[in-house]
Amino acid sequence: MKALRHYNSTMKNQFERFNGLERLYGKGSLQRLSACHVAVIGIGGAGSWLVEALARSGIGQMTLFDADDICVSNTNRQLHALDGTFGQNKVDVMKARCLAISPEMQVNAMATFVTPSNMAMLMEQGFDLVIDACDSFRVKVELIAWCRRNKQKILVVGAAGGRTDPTLIRIRDLAKTEQDALLALIR
């Protein structure tokens, strides 16, 4: 009975925070989003913004992978680069930020890089979606191959590379990638 009260209280709190999503995406959408577990690999220029967008979308659980610390030179492009966060690990700062947005969310901060040698162990958690936002060619290639072999859904993110028109961003098959040198090499 106590567990049911906690669940009802948690769902009420989540509904108050994110009820706009129900209006936007339809009845039951918040429950579906709160049941999702998303992995984000690389918490930099793209990954930091993705993590915050997911937190504000009512995702129930995220696992963040990045071993880097925040540098002052990250300020122009990375969400977590603020006075007071320089020198701190990216995943720890983003975990705190996510919990400030959505206290009921479960955030696993993994201060490690995903590499070909540790990938299988780190990816075996059964994610609903893996988002690759890292900038390592080898890791991107190996991760795409691992996800494909294991029937794991993956979203691969490219770099802005000095582009300034966000209306040109497209979600498409990697084989049809244009205007991104790193992703073009991968396809």
PLM regions and their residue ranges:
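Conserved SAM-binding strand-loop segment of SAM-dependent methyltransferases
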Residues: 106-112
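E1/E1-like adenylate-forming module used to activate ubiquitin-like modifiers
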Residues: 129-187
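Short amphipathic alpha-helix with an adjacent loop that forms part of the alpha/beta core around
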Residues: 117-126
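N-terminal charged helix/coil linker that caps or initiates catalytic domains
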Residues: 2-38
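Glycine-rich phosphate-binding loop and adjoining beta1-alpha1-beta2 segment
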Residues: 64-102
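Conserved N-terminal Rossmann-fold NAD(P)-binding element of oxidoreductases
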Residues: 40-42, 65
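Hydrophobic/small residue at the entry helix of a nucleotide-binding pocket
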Residues: 46
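Conserved S-adenosyl-L-methionine
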Residues: 56-61
